[in-house]
Design a protein with these regions (language model features):
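Phosphate-binding glycine-rich/basic clefts of nucleotide- and phosphate-handling proteins
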Residues: 1-68
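Residue-level signature of catalytic and energy-coupling elements of molecular machines
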Residues: 5, 78, 100, 136
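Interdomain boundary/hinge elements
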Residues: 16-21, 92, 127-128, 150-151
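Active-site lining segments that contact anionic ligands and/or coordinate catalytic metals
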Residues: 38, 53, 95-96, 119
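Phosphate/ATP-binding catalytic cores across multiple sugar-kinase/actin-like superfamilies
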Residues: 66-93, 139-142
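Glycine-rich phosphate-binding loops at beta-strand->alpha-helix junctions
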Residues: 90-114
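Conserved phosphate-binding/catalytic loops in two-lobed NTP-binding clefts
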Residues: 112-135, 146, 152
Length: 153
């Protein structure tokens, strides 16, 4: 997602920004779903035409546009995964919903967008970044659990 923001700013404004700046933009004003009150942030980088440092303002709608392809990939992956879900697991998902984990879960309003697209309950893990590692550790420690959560092709 950071790379998508970096490329968007480069393409639209001819401004080269760093990865950390792109990440700060995502964290501060990035959103997967339109916000009631759009926000903006001042961005500093190097003008690719003149080579001189430059400052500009980018708003949350532009960031959402920059993230659209990444967000659509997430949506498509969720849909494909749900379509291939065994009936027993599908029933659990309808009852309990989907829990978002990982860095993407921290993107504002991703849960709202996925709820709208899937009509399923969506929650964000209490600690989305650690949840992946903890979950993987639990599965690797329990061979029976590993077989129940993996698909064989």
């Amino acid at each position: 997602m950071d790379e998508a923001i970096l490329q968007y700013v480069k393409r639209k404004y001819n401004l080269l920004i760093g990865e950390r700046t792109a990440e700060l933009i995502k964290i501060n004003i990035g959103s997967a779903y339109p916000q009631e009150n759009p926000q903006s942030i001042e961005v500093k980088g190097r003008d690719l035409m003149t080579g001189i440092p430059k400052t500009l303002e980018i708003n949350s709608e532009e960031v959402r546009e920059a993230l659209a392809e990444s967000i659509n990939t997430i949506i498509d992956t969720v849909r494909i995964t749900l379509e291939g879900t065994p009936p027993e697991l599908a029933a659990d998902i309808v009852d309990k919903g989907i829990v978002l984990v990982g860095g993407g879960a921290l993107l504002k309003n991703l849960d709202i967008l996925l709820r709208e697209v899937t009509s399923l309950p969506i929650t964000i893990a209490d600690d989305p970044l650690s949840s992946i590692v903890l979950g993987a550790g639990m599965v690797l420690d329990d061979e029976e659990l590993l077989h129940t959560v993996t698909f064989q092709y």
